[in-house]
Amino acid sequence: MQRRLSQHGLKCRVVYDGTNALKAVESKTPDLILLDVILPDINGLELLKEFRAKHSADELPIIMVSAFNDVDSTAKCIKLGATDYLPKPLNGTILMAKAVASLEAKYFREANQKLLEELHIRATTCPLTGIFNRKVVFDHGENAFLERNSGEGKDFSLLSVDIDFFKKVNDTY
């Protein structure tokens, strides 16, 4: 497995038991885990549960590997949070395809999240000043007003300043 993945430019860290796997993931979270169901010290399914308690499937894809090649084993792994399942003996082509697909999905989700954050910033701030735009001010003002009228909120004040031809001032200075 390691050789096949390394040949395709993927860096691999190999551990041979669950205890060291936990330590390795805790010290540096990998982009992808290939996890055998049968380990010398901890059941791979229990280890999967521990990883899922700390990392979502979006942030840490885990492909389970097992000699059990039946529907129930596959379903159990997926139900516990595995991203995918590979039966032994491993087929190198399928291994690479599933590893690449899992990594691409993770990277696309991360890129989409960054774009959403950037879009949110653009939608809520003025590009010239970097302060909140009118929509945000009106939304927050409306919420504060509603809270105040319901008796739940505190007193509030709102100051609106409008500078004519601000873009010209900003471009000049």
Segments predicted by a language model, with ranges:
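Acidic catalytic/metal-coordinating carboxylates
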Residues: 17-20, 43-46, 69
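Active-site beta3 strand of CheY-like receiver
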Residues: 28-34, 39
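Short amphipathic alpha-helix used as the core "switch/output" element in two-component signaling
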Residues: 23, 45-58
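Two-component/phosphorelay signaling modules centered on CheY-like receiver
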Residues: 1-13
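C-terminal output helix
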Residues: 89-99
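Conserved nucleotide-binding and Mg2+-coordinating catalytic segments in signaling enzymes
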Residues: 120-140, 161-173
